[in-house]
Amino acid sequence: MENKTFLAVDRRWSPPAAAGRTNALTCDVEDYFQVSAFEHLVRRDSWKEWECRIPRNVDRVLDLYDQAGVRGTFFILGWVAENFPEVVRRIVAEGHEVASHGMQHVRVWDQTPDAFRADIVRARTLLQDVTGQRVRGYRAASWSLDERTPWAHRIMAEAGYEYSSSIYPIAHDHYGLPDAPDFPFYVKSAGILEIPASTSRLLGRNLPAAGGGYFRLMPLAVSRWLMQRISRTREMPVVFYFHPWELDPEQPRMTGITARTRFRHYVNLQRFEPRLARLLRDLKWGRMDEIYLGNSG
C-alpha cells in the first residue's frame, strides 16, 4: 500500500504482550448540533442557544461502561470542558482517559497551521485544568487530516500530544484516506504515534469496521465479525468510536438537510444503545493511553 508523503512511517507500533486482545474504546464528546454535517446550519457562536444534551447522554455512556466493567478514552471538545466541566470531571472520576477533540470541532484542513496550533493548545490546557491530569491524545474533527495538512502531526507533538487518532483509511465523500497506513505507526519527522480508526480489508478495499454510523447500519453480528477478524488476523487492537448523541433517538431533528445526511445521522439510533451494551460485553476493551503508551506518565 502506497503511503502519502505527509504520512511517512518512521516505524510501526508493536503491541506489548501485556496488551493481549484489549481493544480501544473511544467516544467523541460532541453534541448532535455540533457535527460537521450540520455546520452550515448551526453557527458555532450560536451553540449555547441550542438544547445541549451532552450531560444526560454522557451519563448514559458512563452507566453502560460501569455495567460492563470497562474503561475507555473520551475525546472531548474544549467547548464542553468550558461549559460542562462537571461532565469531564465525572469521566475522570470513573477511571476513563480524557483526550482532546479540539476546541470547536473545526476540521484541521479548514485551519492555518497557526490557528490549528492555537486551537489544540487551548483545548489541551482547558482539559488539563479541569481534570488535573495530563492530556496525551488528540483526534481531529471528522478525520480531517490529508495532504493539505502535512504540518499537523509536527504541531501536535510540539503542543505536547503523544498520540493522534485522526486518520480513517477508507474512501468517503467527506473524509478518509484509503491509501493511508491501516496500522498504528510513528510519523516520521514528528515522532508522534498515529492510531488510525479500524478497517478490515476485503475484496481489495478497506471496509469501515468499528464505529459510528457504520456500526448502526450493519447488523451487530457483521460488525462483531469484522472486529474479531482484525484482532485475529492482524493481531492488533480494534479502535472503536462513537458519539454520545448516537444513544439519543429523541434528540431534536434538524431541518434543511439532504436525504443522505438525514439517513447517515439518524439511521438506527434507537438500536444503538442495546447494540453497544452487547458489544461491551462481547469483547475486551480499554483506554488508548494504557493500550498504546503503556500508561507511562
Question: Where in the sequence are the language-model features?
Answer:
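Catalytic alpha-helical scaffold of carbohydrate-active enzymes acting on polysaccharides/glycoconjugates
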Residues: 2-203, 222-297
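Surface-exposed cleft-lining segments at the edges of enzyme active sites
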Residues: 207-217
